[in-house]
A protein has these predicted regions:
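Hydrophobic h-region of N-terminal signal peptides that target proteins for export
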Residues: 13-21
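Bacterial N-terminal signal peptides that target proteins for export
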Residues: 1-11
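N-terminal alpha-helical modules
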Residues: 20-125
Length: 125
């Protein structure tokens, strides 16, 4: 198989995967976080709370669906992931100026979103 054909097939597979993932993201549109710093931080907290609920549902389903030997490992991995996320985002929050609060909030939102999507995908592998 030629290199160009392999690249085309690979790109098509990636695009198909992205479109499937995006289709699963439909639901409540996320609010826009425009405004002053306080409003933006509060908005990021609200978005994070939405993703955290979705994460908790996905985690409970993943634990329920996991093989018995996998459950303890999944629980341990989730505890360590929460510790990592919190420490990682705290780093951003310790920066200077009001932008640090926004960086920390976006860190929490984006990492929580990514983990929720990862756990939701466990049953589709």
């Amino acid at each position: 198989m030629s290199m160009m054909l392999r690249m085309t097939i690979g790109l098509a597979a990636v695009l198909a995967l992205v479109s499937v993932v995006r289709a699963g993201d439909q639901g409540e549109p996320e609010p826009s976080c425009d405004g002053n710093t306080f409003q933006m931080v509060e908005c990021l907290k609200a978005k994070t709370a939405q993703w955290d609920k979705r994460l908790n549902v996905a985690y409970q389903k993943a634990v329920q669906d996991a093989q018995p030997a996998q459950r303890d490992q999944l629980r341990a991995a989730q505890r360590l992931w929460v510790q990592y996320r919190d420490a990682n985002c705290l780093y951003y929050g310790m920066g200077e100026g009001t932008i640090a609060r926004l960086d920390a909030g976006e860190c929490m939102r984006s990492m929580t979103e990514a983990r929720a999507k990862e756990l939701e995908g466990l049953g589709h592998q």
